[in-house]
């Protein structure tokens, strides 16, 4: 029997710090209840995907100063539509059908939140965005 909904929910990490409240907007509730757990679950894949992206773009990312690396991450996600769509696919593919339906009702605002969270997550883990380190954190 295919129980995709419960299987997806079961494998997601619990994030206690970010709760949902009645006075939150629908987007903020979706961000805390769905996006943050999915991003945490997909974190190793997001890191590996960015490292692969940087390598395929001549590897300059690894040789530039930290402030420029931060800008590079933001620029790559905002300006490279193909890369951004790949990241969105990694995240949306972990939605339940109910979450996907909610997402489609307000995808523009939720995409913006999603990409801002991905940028922050990659920037916060800058020390892991090195091919040798990443292969050991798997």
Model-derived regions: residue spans:
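N-terminal leader/targeting peptides and immediately adjacent processing regions
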Residues: 1-37
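Short acidic/polar alpha-helix capping motifs at helix-coil junctions
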Residues: 12-13, 49-55, 63-67, 138
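Amphipathic protein-protein interaction modules
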Residues: 65-115
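Long, highly charged low-complexity segments enriched in Glu/Asp and Lys/Arg with interspersed Ser/Thr
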Residues: 106-138
């Amino acid at each position: 029997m295919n129980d995709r909904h419960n299987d997806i929910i079961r494998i997601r990490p619990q994030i206690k710090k970010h709760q949902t409240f009645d006075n939150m907007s629908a987007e903020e509730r979706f961000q805390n209840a769905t996006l943050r757990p999915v991003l945490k679950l997909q974190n190793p894949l997001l890191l590996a995907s960015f490292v692969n992206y940087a390598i395929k773009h001549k590897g300059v990312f690894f040789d530039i100063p930290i402030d420029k690396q931060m800008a590079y991450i933001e620029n790559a996600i905002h300006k490279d539509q193909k890369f951004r769509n790949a990241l969105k696919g990694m995240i949306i593919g972990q939605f339940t059908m109910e979450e996907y339906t909610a997402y489609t009702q307000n995808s523009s605002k939720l995409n913006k939140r999603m990409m801002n969270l991905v940028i922050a997550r990659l920037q916060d883990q800058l020390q892991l965005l090195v091919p040798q380190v990443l292969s050991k954190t798997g």
